[in-house]
């Protein structure tokens, strides 16, 4: 894989550095990783704030409709809309609380399907806004040895990238499987987007390298930090990330993470 080969060359260059330079590189990498985590947290806060504002407006508008109209049919419809909005607010709250509860860097047996569910709750409205069709295949698999919060950060980043690469009405495919031979969890995210030119693939994991001109209309993307952060997280989990892309066809990210050993 071209991107993986570029990363191997980067690691070889780092290994040849003097001890003093190596220490400085390590410190800078740690600082960069913390900055990336704060960027992801800031985007999450912005997304959830916008979501709750939409929910509150829905509740307010239908409450006013219910108060203005006395016929049972209109009131019942208003109550149904208020109930649906409240249930969505509860799902978002649970997803955010799930992330907040796990702010540590502990790697432990984790139900990755739950992590995926929470991420999709947070992105549901955004995907709907751009009429993105999401097709998921979630197999029943053993727990994955990972840090749930960090893997959710990777998932949110890759799904947001996929959404940005797709024209209105495109498709994202998400698949979760278990490779019993390698004892690895396999997470695949594929989009029907614009694709990445082959000559840019070797650079896309470099910090601050971006194929985008800048943030999109939602304010996301364009810094070049996202994929670099994702790759470092997966590497720290002793996992692998493979990138395949074709211009005009789309891009596929395949992530392999260790399966937790049975107790």
Language-model features, listed with the residues they occupy:
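Amphipathic alpha-helical coiled-coil "transmission" helices that mediate dimerization
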Residues: 1-36
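Generic alpha-helical structural signal
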Residues: 3-6, 22, 44, 55, ...
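Short, charge-rich amphipathic segments
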Residues: 17-27, 46-57
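Core catalytic ATP-binding domain of two-component histidine kinases
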Residues: 46, 52-263
